[in-house]
């Protein structure tokens, strides 16, 4: 009998073992769809981004008008731009849900997969930040100024570091040029990291909603989960296209329709919605260095998850107290997101400070304590 090319060809064999004959737990739920959705998001963003880059000019005098030109004069340029801008939002929705799933079901116990995932998140955040600067509107310019300025809080080398990043003494043409270069490069770095992420995942195999060994009950990825993933793609593309076609500017800032002007500061500088929770934590501390450290900690704290897991059970499926705490944490993140979009005045300042304290308390103290308590209740 002739050998099956899919199983014998050196390249096809790798694809086959990752996407076709991959043994998959039979009981994984729709929460396991977000990994493939993130892959689709990345491909969509790279494709639309490439098409936009063909019409974009990374120069302070031309950037804003080149984006306007793309939307007005390029065939379907408006659609490509709207899909790219809103695609970023969906990318973050998917990654936050993906991380939330990992946290709820104890997937962070696969340390290598979890750590590469956090590095992916940080790279995605960097990509989104430099990308937001490119249209060179008011919020692009001032967002870049404010966020890059945070590095000046680093003792001794801070100011030098910022001027080195800017390529001058303020955000100007060299900054825009290098941000465009970075925005073009980083998505390919994300694609490379994704392969590492998947390699680590396939070393151990997928986790499942029960958090138990599933080796005795595995099914092939194709056709079961390929079909399930296609359903996921459809359910994501529907709201994405609806948003891009019906209200493309819903999530954007009106301030960005004004070309960048270093002499006029917008009344309220704020990042895109997906960074607001971290921005709220940054603002909640009155000291600059303290704020920067809290901002970094808000994401880097995820690295500690495997070490803060004290429960004998892996997932939260049968741990009602941890479930309650988890949903309080989710609510708290929504509160932080809302506070980040509000001006710095009473009562938002105190709400932001309380929500920031709660965020760190839940993750660092309450989760390990409740996990230990649940062990005691179950007589472990």
From Swiss-Prot:
Kindly indicate whether the keyword Coiled coil belongs to this entry.
no
As cofactor, the record names:
heme b
Q: Which CDD domains match?
A: cytochrome_b_C, Cytochrome_b_N
Q: What GO cellular-component annotations does this UniProt entry give?
A: mitochondrial inner membrane; respiratory chain complex III
Write down the superkingdom of origin.
Answer: Eukaryota
The primary site where this protein sits is mitochondrion
Task: Spell out the subcellular localization from the entry.
Answer: Mitochondrion inner membrane
Which parts pass through the membrane?
34-54, 78-99, 114-134, 179-199, 227-247, 289-309, 321-341, 348-368
Which residues does the record give as a ubiquinone binding sites?
202
Kindly give the InterPro entries that the UniProt entry links to this protein.
Cyt_b/b6_C (IPR005798), Cyt_b/b6_C_sf (IPR036150), Cyt_b/b6_N (IPR005797), Cytb/b6-like_sf (IPR027387), Cytochrome_b (IPR030689), Cytochrome_b_C_euk/bac (IPR048260), Cytochrome_b_N_euk/bac (IPR048259), Di-haem_cyt_TM (IPR016174)
What is the UniProt remark on how the cofactor binds and its stoichiometry?
Binds 2 heme b groups non-covalently.
Q: So where does heme b b566 get bound?
A: 98, 197
Q: Any extra remark in the record? A: Heme 1 (or BL or b562) is low-potential and absorbs at about 562 nm, and heme 2 (or BH or b566) is high-potential and absorbs at about 566 nm.
Q: What does this protein do?
A: Component of the ubiquinol-cytochrome c reductase complex (complex III or cytochrome b-c1 complex) that is part of the mitochondrial respiratory chain. The b-c1 complex mediates electron transfer from ubiquinol to cytochrome c. Contributes to the generation of a proton gradient across the mitochondrial membrane that is then used for ATP synthesis.
Kindly provide the name given to this protein in its UniProt entry. Answer: Cytochrome b
What's the source species for this entry?
Answer: Daption capense
